[in-house]
Structures are given as C-alpha cells and as structure tokens.
From Swiss-Prot:
GO terms for biological process: proton motive force-driven plasma membrane ATP synthesis. GO terms for molecular function: ATP binding; ATP hydrolysis activity; proton-transporting ATP synthase activity, rotational mechanism; proton-transporting ATPase activity, rotational mechanism. The lineage of its organism: Archaea, Thermoproteota, Thermoprotei, Sulfolobales, Sulfolobaceae. It is a peripheral membrane protein. Component of the A-type ATP synthase that produces ATP from ADP in the presence of a proton gradient across the membrane. The A chain is the catalytic subunit. Pfam families: ATP-synt_ab, ATP-synt_ab_N, ATP-synt_ab_Xtn, ATP-synt_VA_C. Keywords: ATP synthesis, ATP-binding, Cell membrane, Hydrogen ion transport, Ion transport, Membrane, Nucleotide-binding, Translocase, Transport. ATP binds at G233, P234, F235, G236, S237, G238, K239, T240. Coiled coil: none annotated. Its EC number is 7.1.2.2. The gene is atpA. GO terms for cellular component: plasma membrane; proton-transporting two-sector ATPase complex, catalytic domain. It comes from Saccharolobus islandicus (strain M.14.25 / Kamchatka #1) (Sulfolobus islandicus). This is A-type ATP synthase subunit A.
Length: 592
C-alpha cells in the first residue's frame, strides 16, 4: 500500500498526493506525528483529508500513511462507565500514559482495556448453527448491565469450538466458527465502521414511552422508545440542564452522552455529578449504565463529526443486545458548524448561511439510525435507540438552517423559550410551539399502566394552555376583570398547571424526578379542580369565590411536587379529599 505526501495544509484540512487507489472515508495517519485523519474527497491521485487532531507543526512533503480501513470503533465489555474523546480513546488511559492532563497528538491507546479479564458464561455449544447477531455468551459487566456477546453481523456457519466458562480478556478467542471452510475466531470484542448503520431484521412502530421523570416531557410532549427529539434554544435557556436530566433519570438501560463542541466545564459537571447519583429505576450508581464521549469546544473541530458517529454506533451495539438505549448529543449545531468550516476549506459551494448543501442528508442519516427494532440473530429480542439532540440556533432564531432542517427529521420538538427562562420557569419548554408525534402511540400505554383518564387529562391541560394564550392579549389590553367567569377560570387553571405541573426544579432532590404515577396524581388534582370549578361557574358562582374558598389548598397542591416523594403517593389522597370537600361545600351553597 503506497504512502502519500502532504502538498497543502489548511487548518484541519490536509491535501495529499500519490494516494492512488485510496478509498472514501479511509483512515490515514498524517505527518510525522501520525495524526488520525479521514479521507473526505478524492480527485485523481489527490486525497482531501479531514484531520481529527491539531495540525500545527506538520509540513508539506511529510508522509501520509494509509491504513486501508474506515474509521471504526471497538465494541465489547469495558465500555460502560468510561469517558472517551471523540475518537473513542479513553481519557483515563491517555492520562496514565502521558502523565499529563492534556491529550498528546498522535497518541494511540486501545478503546477497550486489553488486560482486564471478564467472566464469560457460554450460551451455545459446539456444533450449533450460528449466524450474525446470535448471543453466544454473557459477561456481567456491571451490576446493571449484562453484556451479551454477539456474533459479528457478517459471520455465519457452524460453531467448531467454544471455550468453557471462565475469565478471558477481550483479545482471547472464545469461539471458532467454520464459515464455508474458513475458520473465523470470535472474541469478546468486535470492530465496526462508525458511518455504516448496524443491521437489524425490521423496524417497529414505537409504542412505549421513554419515561424521563420530567413532567412536561413525559406528559405534554412525550417521546417513545426509539424516537427522535430536538431541543433548540438560545444561550442560557437551559438546553444542557434539560439534556443532563434526560441522561440522569431516563428509563433507558444504557445512556450515551456525547458532549459535541460544548464548553468543557459542562462535561466536568457531568463527570463530577454522575459517580454520586443513583439511578431512580434501580437504585444503583448512574455511571454503571452510562458512557460519556467528551469532545469539547477546545478540541479539534473535525472530531465533532466523529464523536456523533461514535456515540450512535455504540448505541446501536447495545440495541442489538436487546436493550433500550438513549443517545444524548449536545449539540448538533456544533457538528454542523464543523461541516461548514471544512466545506469552506474544501472550497465547496455553500448553501444557506454558508452551511454545505449536504447538511440535510447528513442530519437525516444520523436521525435515521434511531428506532425500535427487531434485532438480527437468536434468541428473538427487541431493542431501541432513542436520540435526543440539542440545537443551538444563534440568537434563538428557529428559522436558521440547522434547526429548520432538524425539524424535518425529528418527531418531538422541545423548543426552549428565553422569556420563560428569564421568568425562572424551568424547564423553559414553550408549550405552544412544541409538538410530539408520539402522543397517540403512547396514550394506550399510559391509559393501561398508569391512569385510564391520562389522555383526557392531558388534552384538558393542553386546551387550557392554548386558550390562556388567546386570552392573554385581551387581559393586557383591558385587564382580567372584563373577562367572562369561565375565561377567568381558564386563567386560574392555567396558572395551576404551570406552577404545579410544568415547572420543575432539576436541582431539588424530590422534584428532579417525577414517577409516572406521581405525574398522574398531580394531573388528577388539576383535572378535578377544573371539572368541579367549571360546573360551579356555570351555576353562577364567581371564579374568585372558588379560589378564595380553597384557602391554602392550591398553594399546597403547588408545593406537593417538591414535598411528596415518589413512594408517598398516599399523601395525594388527603389533598384529593380536601379538594372534593371544598367543592361539596360550594355546591351546597349554590344549591340553596
């Protein structure tokens, strides 16, 4: 394989000649430091290479070493709880090797530790017919995750050898498959190219909600397992805190958090918090189900693209094991900016706002890899990849290309409103602009498993919030006194919905995570208030009298979200009794 020679360097873009027979997206090592790069364009024997490390100091005429392989990552036991850079290099291993807090250029460390021994329990026997995706054994990687060892997708045949139960490293052959006369060894670890989606049997309709513990996300704009969501918002509106809440409390088996081009201190917050936090679904430390990819804004721009693909490939790998995985990417705008930067350096024709014309297709490829699937291989199993990505539009302009193109491909839109954030309403998700295409699909799950009136209660809340917005303009002009009594009740109910349900404190021990049952109990209180109060208003009782009769009950309902724990829901029975008692007294008065 012939090596190339550098002819031009322009930031992260390097042009090399003598690259005959090179392949698109082939990984190369650039210059004397052997910096990792990827071929993104070929013209004759010239290759345009995007380099994933700082190119300072390399010179024309230095060699470019070809590898003949695409950008691939290692998949196997040892991924959970790790912190990787954008190229899947473990940061702790780099620190041990270099004795420095900085990532040295050209450093090569294995993604999966070669020395650790894992206890392998075989699940197949010699002579079995196997195919790609079959589970041949398990490794208990953490108390939360049983790592299922899969046959690589391209391998099929007869199992010639399988090791006995015992401790093995990721490089030890644990099985040998006779594939058309060739002996193919299988190890605990496999490699997969990041730009190629992993295969599956069929894509299924997502019908089960991915519970997040955040009330506005679970109830007003729910996301299903295998769904796609975007969180656009201007600086300071709470994107990162909302995504961190998703990563912490979601009911996913595996969470992969990709910090793509965001500030380093945000990743530092994650790394400090996660070891001490407990998973509310299992009670175990969160790090036992989490993988972090740290590719911060001060790291090379080109590596942002790699980090997104690395994250989604790891998510697909755990999906293939039959798990529900969540990929949180913060933020895809930084990836798009990297594409714009490289497109400009390659002198490509720019499209809207300087972004390359292929931006929509890249975003589509990324979101297309989400979904709930029936996996390949035996035994039959189902897994999902849910994708939630932040988008950072400059100045909060949702018409800019990244946000508008993202909207074409996602089914859930959680727009953050800076005016809500300034009013200290968090999460600052605008209930008028947002949408979810999964409401009809997940309503049956909520009605069956949580509360048979869930859909009815949710729709009442949404209708009330929309009507309140219509009334707000009238109130601004002539004041609330001029409204009809039923409209005054709409304003009061909307205030209760916002204060008791939509607002949520991500830093409060009790309020940070709301179980589905707790959410339904709060909704039920609001629904009861609205239903009974509407009847009384129709009978001529003023809204003000109804609210005054409540005394401290409405503030008590508002405080309940941070006062009543998820395992103390019987306390809501008392609030419900008090509420009904007040309305019974008012009805007696109205009847006389």
């Amino acid at each position: 394989m012939n090596n190339g020679r550098i002819v031009r360097i322009n930031g992260p873009l390097v042009v090399a000649d003598n690259m005959k027979n090179a392949q698109m997206y082939e990984v190369v090592e650039v210059g004397e430091p052997r910096l990792i790069g990827e071929i993104t364009r070929i013209e004759g024997d010239r290759a345009f290479i995007q380099v994933y490390e700082d190119t300072s100091g390399i010179k024309p005429n230095e060699p470019v070493y070809r590898t003949g392989a695409p950008l691939s990552i290692e998949l196997g036991p040892g991924l959970i709880g790790k912190i990787f850079d954008g190229l899947q290099r473990p940061l702790d291993s780099i620190k041990e090797l270099t004795k420095s807090p900085f990532i040295a250029r050209g450093i090569k460390v294995p993604s999966v530790d070669r020395k650790t021994k894992w206890h392998f329990i075989p699940k197949v026997k010699k002579g079995d017919k196997i195919e790609g995706g079959d589970i041949i054994g398990i490794v208990n990687e953490t108390p939360l995750v049983e790592h299922r060892i899969l046959v690589p997708p391209y391998v099929h045949g007869t199992l010639k050898e399988i090791v006995a139960e015992g401790d093995y490293t990721v490089e030890d052959p644990i099985a040998v498959v006779d594939m058309n006369g060739d002996e193919v060894p299988i190890k605990l670890m496999q490699r997969w190219p990041v730009r190629i989606p992993r295969p599956f049997k069929e894509k299924l309709e997502p019908t089960e909600p991915l519970l997040t513990g955040t009330r506005v996300l679970d109830t007003i704009f729910p996301i299903a397992k295998g769904g796609t969501a975007a969180i656009p918002g201007p600086f300071g509106s709470g994107k990162t805190v909302t995504l961190q809440s998703l990563a912490k409390w979601s009911a996913a088996k595996i969470v992969i958090y990709v910090g793509c081009g965001e500030r380093g201190n945000e990743m530092t917050d994650e790394l400090r918090q996660f070891p001490s936090l407990k998973d509310p679904w299992t009670g175990r430390p969160l790090l036992e189900r989490t993988i972090l990819v740290a590719n911060t804004s001060n790291m090379p721009v080109a590596a942002r693209e790699a980090s997104i693909y690395v994250g989604i490939t790891m998510a697909e790998y755990f999906r293939d094991q039959g798990y529900d995985t969540l990929l949180v990417a913060d933020s895809t705008s930084r990836w798009a900016e990297a594409l714009r930067d490289l497109g400009g350096r390659m002198e490509e024709m720019p499209a809207e706002e300087g972004f390359p014309s292929y931006l929509p297709s890249r975003l589509a490829e990324y979101y297309e890899r989400a979904g709930r699937v029936k996996t390949v291989g035996k035994p039959e199993r189902f897994g999902s990849v849910t994708v939630a990505s932040a988008v950072s539009p400059p100045g909060g302009d949702f018409t800019e290309p990244v946000t508008s193109q993202t909207l074409r491909f996602v089914k859930v839109f959680w727009p953050l409103d800076v005016s809500l954030a300034q009013a200290r309403h968090y999460p600052a998700i605008n209930w008028l602009q947002g949408f979810s295409a999964y409401v009809d699909l997940v309503a049956n799950w909520w009605n069956t498993n949580v509360d048979p009136k869930w859909r009815e209660m949710r729709d009442m809340m949404v209708r009330t919030l929309i009507r309140e917005d219509e009334l707000r303009q009238i109130v601004r002009l002539v004041g609330p006194e001029s409204l009809a009594e039923k409209d005054k009740l709409v304003l009061e109910t909307a205030r209760l919905i916002k204060e008791a349900f939509l607002k949520q404190n991500a830093y409060d021990d009790i309020d940070a995570f709301s179980s589905p049952q707790k959410q339904a109990r709060v909704m039920r209180l609001i629904y009861l208030f609205n239903t009974h109060a509407s009847r009384l208003v129709e009978r001529g009782i003023p809204t003000k009298k109804i609210v005054d009769s409540m005394g401290q009950l409405l503030p008590e309902i508002i405080r309940s979200k941070a006062a009543i724990k998820n395992d103390e829901l019987n306390k809501y029975d008392e609030l419900e009794r008090k509420l009904i008692s007040v309305f019974e007294n008012l009805e007696k008065e109205a009847g006389t």
